[in-house]
């Protein structure tokens, strides 16, 4: 494990290491602040290192703050981040992860400037390259159920080999293997 100070300063390293250990982002959809700590403890104990609280959950910034402070070894942050102001609010709450259903260059640049890992939602090679050019640490292929493993394989053939691609939306235990064989690095589940 990294020292706490180093973990707090290099979110991208924590992202890479967490994704290698457990290729799943736990999406804590609808979680309340009261539920957040016991759920996060169970997930971290089970090996999860990437925890996302969607901003459309009840009082998400309180949950993010509680989880981030209780589990500094984990990369904790928000999903459904659509605007720059939300990036700043997540950062102020202690979050270091920004996940979006779409690609917004301003959101990516704001997150990167704050040393936060940013995973914007993309569906096409054009969006994927634009997101990477803006500084995204990885790509959220969303909704994955609308994109076949064959399309994922074609996209991976042209994307940089180092680009991390996560499938989110409609992912099931039954289709994970096909997506991984096509080049997916991880999944968002929740």
Question: Model features per residue range: what roles?
Answer:
Residues 101-107, 140-148, 184-190:
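Glycine-rich phosphate-binding active-site loops on the catalytic face of alpha/beta enzymes
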Residues 7-96, 103, 113, 173-174, ...:
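Conserved N-terminal beta1-alpha1 strand-loop-helix module at the mouth
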Residues 87-127, 131:
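Hydrophobic, well-structured mid-protein blocks that either form specific transmembrane helices
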Residues 24-28, 51-53, 76-79, 98-99, ...:
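Hydrophobic faces of well-ordered beta-strands that scaffold small-molecule active sites
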